[in-house]
UniProtKB/Swiss-Prot annotation:
Main subcellular localisation: plastid
Annotated source species: Euglena stellata
Biological process, per Gene Ontology: photosynthesis
GO cellular component: chloroplast thylakoid membrane; photosystem II
NCBIfam families: PRK13686.1
Disulfide cysteine pairs (residue numbers): none
Domain of life, source organism: Eukaryota
Protein role: A core subunit of photosystem II (PSII), probably helps stabilize the reaction center.
InterPro entries: PSII_Ycf12_core-subunit (IPR010284)
Location of the protein in the cell: Plastid, Chloroplast thylakoid membrane
Protein name as it appears in the record: Photosystem II reaction center protein Psb30
Keywords: Chloroplast, Membrane, Photosynthesis, Photosystem II, Plastid, Thylakoid, Transmembrane, Transmembrane helix
Amino acid sequence: MNAELIVQLGSLALITVAGPAIIVLLFLKQGNL
């Protein structure tokens, strides 16, 4: 496998996981206020 492909898959997976996580954290912060 190419290193570029691994990097793209890794970044895509990171965005897929981090996206909803950030939204949940922001929602919880607003909820606690």
